[in-house]
Protein backbone atom coordinates (compact mmCIF):
# COMPACT_ATOMS: atom_id res chain seq x y z
CA UNK A 1 0.00 0.00 0.00
CA UNK A 2 2.75 2.39 -1.00
CA UNK A 3 2.32 5.73 -2.75
CA UNK A 4 4.07 6.07 -6.11
CA UNK A 5 5.52 9.54 -5.56
CA UNK A 6 8.39 8.46 -3.31
CA UNK A 7 6.94 9.73 -0.02
CA UNK A 8 6.02 6.91 2.35
CA UNK A 9 3.51 7.27 5.20
CA UNK A 10 3.55 4.41 7.71
CA UNK A 11 0.83 4.21 10.35
CA UNK A 12 2.15 3.03 13.72
CA UNK A 13 -1.20 2.91 15.52
CA UNK A 14 -3.30 5.64 17.14
CA UNK A 15 -2.06 8.98 15.73
CA UNK A 16 1.59 8.02 15.32
CA UNK A 17 2.84 8.18 11.74
CA UNK A 18 6.27 7.96 10.14
CA UNK A 19 6.78 10.05 7.00
CA UNK A 20 9.79 9.26 4.82
CA UNK A 21 10.54 11.44 1.81
CA UNK A 22 12.22 10.42 -1.41
CA UNK A 23 15.26 12.52 -0.43
CA UNK A 24 15.65 10.61 2.83
CA UNK A 25 14.16 12.99 5.40
CA UNK A 26 12.39 11.03 8.14
CA UNK A 27 9.68 12.65 10.26
CA UNK A 28 7.77 11.02 13.13
CA UNK A 29 4.50 12.60 14.28
CA UNK A 30 3.13 12.10 17.83
CA UNK A 31 5.39 9.34 19.24
CA UNK A 32 3.19 6.98 21.28
CA UNK A 33 5.07 3.69 21.30
CA UNK A 34 5.74 1.82 24.56
CA UNK A 35 2.16 2.01 25.86
CA UNK A 36 0.47 2.00 22.46
CA UNK A 37 -1.52 -1.26 22.21
CA UNK A 38 -1.68 -0.88 18.43
CA UNK A 39 2.02 -0.22 17.78
CA UNK A 40 3.05 -2.90 15.26
CA UNK A 41 4.96 -5.72 16.92
CA UNK A 42 8.60 -5.83 15.87
CA UNK A 43 8.57 -2.50 14.06
CA UNK A 44 11.77 -0.50 14.45
CA UNK A 45 12.09 3.19 13.74
CA UNK A 46 14.80 4.12 11.23
CA UNK A 47 18.16 4.91 12.81
CA UNK A 48 18.07 8.29 11.07
CA UNK A 49 15.06 10.13 12.46
CA UNK A 50 15.46 13.80 11.64
CA UNK A 51 12.38 15.40 13.18
CA UNK A 52 9.63 14.60 15.66
CA UNK A 53 6.48 16.71 15.31
CA UNK A 54 4.05 17.04 18.22
CA UNK A 55 0.43 18.12 17.75
CA UNK A 56 -0.39 18.61 21.44
CA UNK A 57 0.62 17.61 24.95
CA UNK A 58 -1.54 14.60 25.82
CA UNK A 59 0.31 11.47 26.85
CA UNK A 60 -1.00 9.36 23.98
CA UNK A 61 0.83 11.74 21.64
CA UNK A 62 4.06 12.65 23.46
CA UNK A 63 4.81 9.82 25.90
CA UNK A 64 7.87 8.60 23.99
CA UNK A 65 9.23 11.92 22.75
CA UNK A 66 12.16 12.05 25.19
CA UNK A 67 13.55 8.53 24.59
CA UNK A 68 12.95 8.72 20.83
CA UNK A 69 14.51 12.16 20.38
CA UNK A 70 17.42 11.23 22.64
CA UNK A 71 18.18 7.93 20.90
CA UNK A 72 17.98 9.38 17.39
CA UNK A 73 19.24 12.90 18.12
CA UNK A 74 16.03 14.20 16.57
CA UNK A 75 14.84 17.80 16.53
CA UNK A 76 11.39 18.14 18.11
CA UNK A 77 8.95 20.61 16.54
CA UNK A 78 5.97 21.76 18.60
CA UNK A 79 3.96 24.77 19.64
CA UNK A 80 6.19 27.08 21.67
CA UNK A 81 5.07 26.13 25.18
CA UNK A 82 5.13 22.40 24.44
CA UNK A 83 8.60 22.69 22.92
CA UNK A 84 9.73 24.40 26.11
CA UNK A 85 8.11 21.68 28.25
CA UNK A 86 9.82 18.78 26.44
CA UNK A 87 13.10 20.68 26.57
CA UNK A 88 12.75 20.77 30.35
CA UNK A 89 12.11 17.00 30.25
CA UNK A 90 15.45 16.40 28.53
CA UNK A 91 14.99 16.92 24.79
CA UNK A 92 18.10 18.72 23.53
CA UNK A 93 17.01 20.05 20.14
CA UNK A 94 13.66 21.79 19.74
CA UNK A 95 11.94 24.20 17.39
CA UNK A 96 9.13 26.12 19.06
CA UNK A 97 6.59 27.69 16.74
CA UNK A 98 2.96 28.76 16.75
CA UNK A 99 -0.27 28.60 14.80
CA UNK A 100 0.12 30.03 11.31
CA UNK A 101 3.90 29.70 11.41
CA UNK A 102 6.02 27.83 8.90
CA UNK A 103 9.42 26.18 9.30
CA UNK A 104 11.76 24.53 6.82
CA UNK A 105 12.69 20.94 7.73
CA UNK A 106 15.24 20.00 5.08
CA UNK A 107 13.16 19.95 1.88
CA UNK A 108 9.86 19.74 3.81
CA UNK A 109 7.90 22.92 4.50
CA UNK A 110 5.89 22.45 7.71
CA UNK A 111 3.07 24.83 8.57
CA UNK A 112 1.31 24.69 11.93
CA UNK A 113 -2.46 25.05 11.59
CA UNK A 114 -5.40 25.20 13.96
CA UNK A 115 -7.01 22.25 15.74
CA UNK A 116 -9.87 22.12 18.25
CA UNK A 117 -8.82 20.07 21.26
CA UNK A 118 -7.31 20.45 24.73
CA UNK A 119 -3.57 20.17 25.34
CA UNK A 120 -2.48 19.79 28.96
CA UNK A 121 0.62 17.71 29.66
CA UNK A 122 0.36 15.50 32.73
CA UNK A 123 3.16 14.22 34.93
CA UNK A 124 3.68 13.43 38.62
CA UNK A 125 3.44 17.13 39.44
CA UNK A 126 0.02 17.56 37.85
CA UNK A 127 -1.28 19.03 34.60
CA UNK A 128 0.77 21.70 32.84
CA UNK A 129 -0.25 24.32 30.31
CA UNK A 130 1.67 23.55 27.11
CA UNK A 131 -0.02 25.78 24.57
CA UNK A 132 -2.92 24.81 22.34
CA UNK A 133 -3.51 21.85 20.07
CA UNK A 134 -2.42 22.07 16.45
CA UNK A 135 -2.21 20.25 13.15
CA UNK A 136 0.43 20.34 10.42
CA UNK A 137 0.45 20.84 6.67
CA UNK A 138 3.55 19.34 5.06
CA UNK A 139 4.56 20.50 1.60
CA UNK A 140 7.11 18.17 0.02
CA UNK A 141 8.55 18.71 -3.48
CA UNK A 142 7.27 16.10 -5.91
CA UNK A 143 4.76 14.76 -3.38
CA UNK A 144 1.09 15.37 -2.62
CA UNK A 145 0.60 17.97 0.12
CA UNK A 146 -0.08 16.25 3.45
CA UNK A 147 -2.31 17.35 6.34
CA UNK A 148 -2.09 15.76 9.80
CA UNK A 149 -5.02 17.13 11.78
CA UNK A 150 -3.82 16.01 15.22
CA UNK A 151 -6.69 15.51 17.64
CA UNK A 152 -9.58 17.75 16.68
CA UNK A 153 -13.26 18.37 16.24
CA UNK A 154 -14.47 19.45 12.83
CA UNK A 155 -14.39 23.25 12.48
CA UNK A 156 -15.33 25.68 9.74
CA UNK A 157 -11.84 27.11 9.28
CA UNK A 158 -10.75 23.81 7.78
CA UNK A 159 -12.00 25.53 4.64
CA UNK A 160 -9.17 28.05 5.07
CA UNK A 161 -6.65 25.21 5.30
CA UNK A 162 -8.05 23.96 2.00
CA UNK A 163 -7.94 27.38 0.37
CA UNK A 164 -4.41 28.19 1.53
CA UNK A 165 -2.62 24.85 1.15
CA UNK A 166 -4.80 22.48 -0.95
CA UNK A 167 -3.88 19.30 0.95
CA UNK A 168 -4.29 16.19 -1.16
CA UNK A 169 -3.83 13.56 1.57
CA UNK A 170 -5.50 14.17 4.94
CA UNK A 171 -4.74 12.21 8.10
CA UNK A 172 -7.86 12.62 10.23
CA UNK A 173 -8.91 11.29 13.66
CA UNK A 174 -12.14 9.32 13.31
CA UNK A 175 -12.62 7.35 16.55
CA UNK A 176 -15.03 9.71 18.29
CA UNK A 177 -15.39 10.41 22.03
CA UNK A 178 -12.18 12.46 22.35
CA UNK A 179 -12.13 13.64 18.72
CA UNK A 180 -14.51 13.75 15.82
CA UNK A 181 -16.10 10.50 14.70
CA UNK A 182 -16.89 9.32 11.18
CA UNK A 183 -19.83 11.71 10.65
CA UNK A 184 -17.75 14.74 11.58
CA UNK A 185 -14.66 13.42 9.79
CA UNK A 186 -16.69 13.14 6.59
CA UNK A 187 -17.62 16.81 6.94
CA UNK A 188 -13.96 17.62 7.63
CA UNK A 189 -12.95 15.78 4.46
CA UNK A 190 -15.51 17.85 2.56
CA UNK A 191 -14.15 21.10 4.01
CA UNK A 192 -10.52 20.16 3.36
CA UNK A 193 -11.09 18.87 -0.16
CA UNK A 194 -8.50 16.09 0.01
CA UNK A 195 -9.20 13.10 -2.21
CA UNK A 196 -7.37 10.61 0.05
CA UNK A 197 -8.16 10.16 3.75
CA UNK A 198 -5.87 8.22 6.09
CA UNK A 199 -7.91 7.46 9.24
CA UNK A 200 -6.16 7.88 12.61
CA UNK A 201 -7.04 7.73 16.32
CA UNK A 202 -9.45 4.81 16.07
CA UNK A 203 -9.57 1.32 17.56
CA UNK A 204 -6.82 1.95 20.11
CA UNK A 205 -9.09 1.98 23.16
CA UNK A 206 -12.74 0.91 23.69
CA UNK A 207 -14.29 4.43 23.49
CA UNK A 208 -12.82 4.99 20.01
CA UNK A 209 -15.56 3.21 18.10
CA UNK A 210 -15.44 4.95 14.71
CA UNK A 211 -14.08 2.90 11.82
CA UNK A 212 -12.71 3.57 8.34
CA UNK A 213 -15.48 1.38 6.91
CA UNK A 214 -18.13 3.65 8.40
CA UNK A 215 -16.31 6.76 7.22
CA UNK A 216 -16.14 5.34 3.69
CA UNK A 217 -19.95 5.24 3.54
CA UNK A 218 -20.19 8.94 4.46
CA UNK A 219 -17.59 10.72 2.33
CA UNK A 220 -18.37 12.22 -1.06
CA UNK A 221 -18.00 10.26 -4.27
CA UNK A 222 -14.41 10.26 -5.47
CA UNK A 223 -12.90 10.45 -1.99
CA UNK A 224 -10.82 7.43 -1.03
CA UNK A 225 -10.74 6.29 2.58
CA UNK A 226 -7.70 4.06 2.99
CA UNK A 227 -8.52 0.85 4.85
CA UNK A 228 -5.28 0.23 6.69
CA UNK A 229 -3.95 -1.40 9.84
CA UNK A 230 -0.95 -0.41 11.98
CA UNK A 231 2.26 -1.17 10.14
CA UNK A 232 0.79 -0.44 6.70
CA UNK A 233 2.53 2.08 4.45
CA UNK A 234 0.73 4.35 2.03
What are these regions (language model features)?
Residues 41-103, 108-119:
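Active-site HxH/HxHxD metal-binding segment of metal-dependent hydrolases
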Residues 35-36, 58-63, 83-86, 101-104, ...:
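Active-site environment of divalent metal-dependent phosphoester hydrolases
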Residues 28-31, 49-57, 77-80, 146-150, ...:
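Active-site neighborhood of phospho(di)ester-bond hydrolases with catalytic His/Asp-centered motifs
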Residues 8-11, 27-30, 109-115, 145-151:
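Active-site-proximal beta-strand elements of phosphoester/diester hydrolases
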Residues 121-191:
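Active-site-proximal loop/helix segments of hydrolase catalytic cores
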Residues 87-102, 186-234:
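Binuclear metal-ion centers of metallo-dependent hydrolases, dominated by the metallo-beta-lactamase
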Residues 1-26, 33-36, 104, 214-223, ...:
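Zn-dependent metallo-beta-lactamase
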Residues 18-58, 63-70, 118-128, 152-164:
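Pre-active-site segment of Zn-dependent metallo-hydrolases
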Amino acid sequence: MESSNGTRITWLGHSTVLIQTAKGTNILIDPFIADNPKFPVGFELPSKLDYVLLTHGHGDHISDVVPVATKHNSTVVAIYELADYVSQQGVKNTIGMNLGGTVQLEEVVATMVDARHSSGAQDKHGTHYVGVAAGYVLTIPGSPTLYHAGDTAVFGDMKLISELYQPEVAMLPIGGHFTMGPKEAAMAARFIGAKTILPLHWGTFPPLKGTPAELATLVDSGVRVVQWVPGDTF
